[in-house]
Amino acid sequence: MDKLSIREDNYNIKHKTISLNRASSVTRNLKGLLKFLGPAFVVSVAYIDPGNFATNISGGSSFNYNLIWVILWSNLMAIFLQTMSAKLGIATGCSLPEMCAKVFSKRANWIFWIVGELGAMATDLAEFIGGTLGLYLLFRIPMIYAGLLTGVLTFIIVYMEKYGQKMVETIIAALIAVICVAYTIELFLARPAWTQVGMHTLIPSLPNGEAVLIAVGMLGATVMPHVIYLHSELVQHRNTNSSDKEKLHHLKMEKIDILIAMNIAFVVNAAMVIVSAAVFFKHGIKVSTIEEAHRSLQPLLGNLSSGAFGIALLASGLSSSAVGTMAGQTIMKGFVNLSIPINLRRIITMLPALIIIALGINPMRVLVLSQVALSFILPFPIIQMLLIAGRKDLMGILVNKKFTKIVGFIIATMIILLNIILLYLTFTGQT
């Protein structure tokens, strides 16, 4: 009997030890993962910016749940390109602009810098106006004062980088969380038809010609050029740049970071379409402006819904505007090895937006024109990245494999063609 008791005790001790070891291993793995989380959350902000609000709301209010699949495909392409950008940064120990400076001629890099800066400024213009609109809709602050306050708030976010990149990543992740909570509230209040949501997420459909136009707008303007540049820079803060084994581990962790962050962005974008379909389409309201969407939510779903919408728009505008400023710094430093104080850059980039606000120009029109500008610029970082990431002498063990090159070429061609179509439709007045 004593021997049996001893055996049972030994068995229990052994299994408790195994359980403790497993728990300890899970804790270690989680801590290791948390150390690498952050860069993808920063760049994911570009995929839930005020421009996305406009296109997603338009798509849902016009075509019910039919265009949710566009969000899914856009997200898959974005994951692929952001992974390649991060891989380039990890493999080379340099950002994409820095690698361009090494690979291409000085004249070419000056052109790349000008084009990249224009892209960052066009993006920042849209984000800044989105943040301003958020403040205006929430607090009815006059647009010009809301613009000045947006400038101050985004400067504070960017200034926090002084205390380390992790600080900025945490602030932006918190703002993303605010957007997620706001749209969770919206979904709860909207009560969508989930069966239709699931069907239209997986089954592509384009009811008519106008749906094609909106789908092109949603898909063609999804990938933002400035965050392709920025992602390759953000991974440097965790890049030991030593052995191939460490690079492979870093890439593995960053892929997890990208999958988590980009799928959160997918859920938020899908929620925008779903809420718009469940509320506006259901009641026969075709929404064409952000202000109209905010105004229409209140009588249909109440103050909580319109308030959540305003908060989400404000958080989106502030976070994405801050990211645009960071990207501008990366672009200038990388291509031409120049830099200006972050506060001066913030002032320079906010001036065009303040002028537009002061002149009373329609913010929705500005959002459209900024997307057009980005459409011109987008091919540059994609082609640069594909050329560099395909070179074994630069990428080493992380060089793009043949299959990755083919997929990259197909995605790049598709995005560029869609943007050309979007430009044509915009200039011919069909958007």
Curated annotation (Swiss-Prot):
Top-rank taxon, per record: Bacteria
Membrane-protein topology: Multi-pass membrane protein
GO molecular function, one term: manganese ion transmembrane transporter activity
GO BP annotations listed: iron ion transmembrane transport
Keyword annotations from UniProtKB, A to Z: Cell membrane, Ion transport, Membrane, Plasmid, Symport, Transmembrane, Transmembrane helix, Transport
GO cellular component terms attached to this protein's record: plasma membrane
TM spans (from-to): 33-53, 61-81, 110-130, 141-161, 170-190, 211-231, 258-278, 307-327, 347-367, 368-388, 406-426
Localization per record: Cell membrane
Transport is among the record's keywords: yes
Pfam families: Nramp
Summary of the function given for this chain in its UniProt record: H(+)-stimulated, divalent metal cation uptake system.
Similarity remark: Belongs to the NRAMP family.
Stored HAMAP family: NRAMP
Matching NCBIfam families: nramp (TIGR01197), Nramp_1 (NF037982), PRK00701.1 (NF001923)
This protein's name: Divalent metal cation transporter MntH
Species the sequence originates in: Clostridium acetobutylicum (strain ATCC 824 / DSM 792 / JCM 1419 / IAM 19013 / LMG 5710 / NBRC 13948 / NRRL B-527 / VKM B-1787 / 2291 / W)
Top-level taxonomy: Bacteria, Bacillati, Bacillota, Clostridia, Eubacteriales
Annotated gene: mntH
